[in-house]
Regions:
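Flavin (primarily FAD) cofactor-binding/catalytic cores of flavoenzymes
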Residues: 2-45, 75-432, 436, 446-458
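Redox-cofactor-proximal catalytic regions of oxidoreductases
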Residues: 40-64, 251
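A short small-residue
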Residues: 62-66, 378-380
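A short acidic, helix-capping loop that chelates divalent metal ions and anchors anionic groups
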Residues: 68-72
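Long, low-complexity intrinsically disordered regions
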Residues: 442-443
Length: 458
């Protein structure tokens, strides 16, 4: 069976794959993007109906294009985000092939590059970029067995309250997804129990500026690693209902029963950790720390922004905090459904090269894999705190494109047998004038590494 030769093969047609395509196109590097479903599929079919972006439209976008029909300070719906990504891909002419699932990537025997098997044929690629991100498989802790007699689903499968059977609901996980789903269910008339773990809860806005702006001017988007001990702390922020600060005391005052982390299950009862008050109070402390930093920045720079003392006011601790539930009998409480907002795990089973650790996680430095020729894109904290955002992945993609350009420069004078698909990489091969995913890869001297432009958060 013949294989199609391509210089760079990108796996994944979401925001990371699109950003990667843009920067490779600018450098004249031939490539193809393989997407197993539609462009931005996860935004379209694996999120709840009312989801909006967690950041304002001026922030959660690519640098070169605004989100059509969305005011800069508004929060785009999931449909608007998906349509935006597809429109951006069209604008840059990204060579995306949809409906193509990558089954395996292996090193080529006796030759440079990688052999890629898909459901629509095979490829031989000089470089491979894994742009699928880490959110591939829903992660549900093995706590409550299926025999418990309640409906259990992951947040990626939740759509709206009417999807769930009649009865009360336990939501496990108090990050952005868990908080918004719990709030939606409570507003629909359900009695909701919300299991709260460690979290950060930044202000939605403070002194007239969104928290995304504050993280930018304070340099916090550029942190290259989470603070020690906070590696698994989730962030609770919401753009729902026009955007508001997540306040667990306020959620409790509205009728949601807060509980600690779900730890175990036995005889129809879910047991919770004795950590609820600690988790809520540490989230409050995180909020106040950012407010303090913002106030200091305003004073230090003489900026005229209105003071906002009400941002520091807390409601009294609810009864669920002062006298927390140690366990919940699901039947007695009328709980018929459990929504697990407990995140995802990566799935790189198709990447069959020496690029993963013993836990299946990428081994890399700023996306450059320990396997020469393989790159990762779209990882949280790939280079900085902002790497998970659209603008952040765009800058990470620029860096990866620069690295590929440098590596191509080393190969310009590489002797390559004419029988290999990379014969045109020899010295003197013409620089491609346009992206052509169907052509045998050409060659180019490495593109100059330009200074990184300012992110949209600054």
């Amino acid at each position: 069976m013949t294989s199609e030769a391509i210089e760079v093969l990108i796996v994944g047609g979401g925001q990371a794959g699109i950003a990667m395509s843009e920067h490779l196109t600018e450098r004249g590097i031939r490539h193809v993007v393989l997407e197993r479903e539609r462009v931005a599929e996860r935004w379209r079919s694996e999120r709840w109906d009312s989801l909006v972006a967690n950041g304002p439209a001026w922030h959660d976008r690519f640098p070169g294009m605004e989100i059509p029909g969305v005011a800069p300070d508004a929060f785009a719906s999931k449909e608007q985000v998906a349509d935006y990504l597809a429109a951006y891909a069209d604008r840059i002419g990204a060579p995306i092939r949809t409906g193509v699932e990558v089954n395996s990537v292996r090193k080529r025997e006796g030759a440079n590059g990688f052999h890629v098997e898909t459901n629509a044929g095979a490829y031989d690629a000089r470089y491979v970029v894994a742009a699928t991100g880490p959110f591939q498989l829903p992660s549900i802790p093995p706590i409550i067995p299926e025999a418990a007699g309640v409906t259990q689903l992951h947040s990626s499968a939740y759509r709206n309250p009417s999807q769930l059977p009649e009865g009360n609901v336990l939501v496990v996980g108090a990050g952005s997804s868990g908080v918004q789903i719990a709030d939606e269910l409570q507003r629909s008339g359900r009695q909701v129990y919300l299991a709260v773990g460690p979290h950060d809860r930044p202000p939605r806005s403070y002194r007239g500026r969104d928290f995304c702006w504050w993280l930018g001017v304070l340099g916090l988007w550029e942190l290259n690693a989470p603070p020690a001990g906070a590696e698994h702390v989730t962030i609770a922020v919401s753009g729902a209902h026009g955007g508001r600060t997540v306040d667990f005391r306020e959620l409790a005052a509205g009728g949601i029963t807060l509980v600690g982390r779900a730890n175990a299950y036995e005889n129809g009862k879910v047991r919770f950790g004795a950590d609820l008050a600690k988790n809520v109070e540490e989230g409050d402390a995180n909020l106040f720390a950012l407010l303090d930093a913002a106030d200091a920045y305003v004073e230090r720079n003489g900026i005229d922004l209105p003071e906002e003392p009400e941002a520091r006011r807390l409601l009294p601790a609810p009864a669920s905090m002062t006298n927390p539930l140690a366990e919940l009998d699901l039947a007695e409480a009328g709980v018929s459904s459990i929504v697990w907002a407990t995140g995802f795990r990566a799935d790189y089973g198709w990447l069959q090269v020496d690029a993963l650790d013993e836990h299946g996680r990428p081994r890399h430095q700023r996306g450059v894999s320990t396997e020469p020729g393989v790159y990762f894109l779209g990882l949280p904290w790939q280079s900085r705190r902002g790497s998970s955002f659209i603008w952040g992945v765009w800058h990470d993609a620029k860096y990866i494109a620069d690295q590929i350009s440098i590596q191509r420069g080393y190969l310009v004078n590489e002797p390559a047998p004419d029988s290999q698909p990379y014969a045109s990489l020899r010295a003197g091969a013409a620089r491609p004038s346009a992206v052509d995913a169907d052509a045998v890869p050409g060659s180019a001297a490495p593109a100059p590494v330009t200074a990184q432009t300012t992110g949209t958060h600054a």
